[in-house]
Design a protein with these regions (language model features):
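Periplasmic-binding protein-like
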Residues: 130, 192-196, 203, 234-258, ...
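A ligand-binding cleft/hinge motif common to bilobed small-molecule-binding domains
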Residues: 90-93, 214, 219-237
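Mature extracytoplasmic/periplasmic domains
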Residues: 257-317
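Extracytoplasmic ligand-binding site segments that recognize negatively charged/polar headgroups
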Residues: 34-42, 66, 80-217
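A bilobed periplasmic-binding-protein/Venus flytrap-type ligand-binding module shared by bacterial periplasmic
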Residues: 133-140, 176-179, 250-263, 281
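Conserved C-terminal helix/tail region of periplasmic/extracytoplasmic solute-binding proteins
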Residues: 313-338
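Short beta-strand->loop
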Residues: 101-110, 122-125, 220, 236-248, ...
Length: 338
């Protein structure tokens, strides 16, 4: 009997000291988009990272403004995410209020390989860039647009689409149009009046415009080059144009939250995002332009994305300054565009 008790005691001790697998596994919470982005992110980034570091990466899908609202509500010391990724216009306020960790290139050495324009303040960085221009159906019988002003051509009446001001592409489009029809990028009265006159279909997500183009609900739309090239890659008869007046940039920005309990892993995930392998995957599969200047792309992909010779031409706005005036611009937009 004594031997049996000893054996049971030994088994309990062995079981209690054995590794508990998933029960001890760290979970890293990151934000990301759905759809095709999610597919490429899982294959190129998440699965290899989980395997290498024995962690669980939980991806919260949505849009930048939703994630920032959740972060601000939770407070800087108890963030719902370890890694916050999205469009830059949503981030100046939480950055100013100390929600983000200082950039760490010892944990993420690929930061040293970024174009200087990709560094934002002391906390953040752009991982990918896309150019905002005009996308049109090549089978619609309309002429190829060359200028932003072509958006107002009568041939597109009822068949053109853009975004609400809350969308990053939407406010960039508003700025460009404000300069064309007014005094400068921030002559919002002129820009809103011009867009109102065009009476476009208005959406809040770029994926919606991609569906509109695919289903031929519209034949001309404001869209980034990456989204257009993805449509073309799937056999949709569309083409993208860089209007003659210039193309603003849609930047995909990332940072580690200050209150994260997993900062070292969080920065390592960002380093993986910036690696030539992952940057190449996003360029090849989704046509997002790498911000890591050491990335060497296949020639057929390099022709479709931003290259070293394009960097000086990029139109990047000071979103920290924009954030101070955005509420009043949004109020005007909502009042005029109802």
């Amino acid at each position: 009997m004594k031997g049996a008790v000893t054996l049971v005691t030994l088994l309990i001790a062995l079981l209690s000291s054995a590794p508990r697998g998933d029960a001890q596994q760290t979970t890293l919470v990151v934000t990301g988009y759905g759809g095709r982005w999610s597919e490429v992110m899982k294959k190129a980034l998440v699965e290899p990272f989980e395997k290498k570091h024995n962690v669980k990466v939980e991806v919260v899908t949505g849009i930048s403004t939703e994630w920032v609202a959740k972060l601000m509500a939770a407070g800087p010391d108890n963030p719902p995410f370890d890694v916050l990724f999205g469009n830059e216009p949503a981030f100046p306020i939480p950055r100013e209020r100390g929600f983000f960790d200082k950039r760490d290139d010892t944990l993420a050495p690929n930061i040293k390989n970024l174009y200087p324009k990709a560094l934002i303040g002391e906390t953040s960085l752009a991982m990918f860039w896309g150019r905002i221009g005009l996308t049109y159906r090549t089978d619609s019988g309309i002429k190829k647009p060359v200028s932003w002003k072509d958006f107002w051509d009568d041939a597109y009446t009822g068949k053109r689409s853009t975004y609400v001001i809350g969308n990053t592409l939407g406010i960039n489009f508003l700025f460009v149009i404000s300069k064309i029809f007014g005094k400068d990028y921030f002559d919002i009265d002129a820009g809103v009046a011009a867009i109102k006159k065009a009476q476009p279909k208005l959406v809040d997500f770029s994926g919606t415009i991609e569906k509109q183009l695919e289903q031929k609900e519209v034949v001309l739309a404001v869209l980034h080059d990456a989204g257009t090239n993805d449509l073309k890659n799937r056999g949709i008869p569309v083409d993208w144009v860089a209007p003659s007046e210039g193309t603003p940039i849609l930047d995909q920005v990332v940072q580690v939250t200050r209150g994260s309990k997993n900062k070292e892993l969080a920065w390592k995930l960002i380093d993986a995002y910036l690696s030539p392998e992952v940057q190449t995957a996003f360029a090849t599969e989704l046509f997002w332009s790498p911000t890591n200047k050491t990335v060497k792309l296949p020639a057929d992909v390099a022709r479709k994305v931003i290259g070293p010779g394009d960097i000086d031409k990029l139109v990047l706005f000071d979103w920290a300054q924009v954030a101070k005036q955005r509420p009043q611009w949004t109020e005007k937009w909502n009042r005029e565009m109802r």
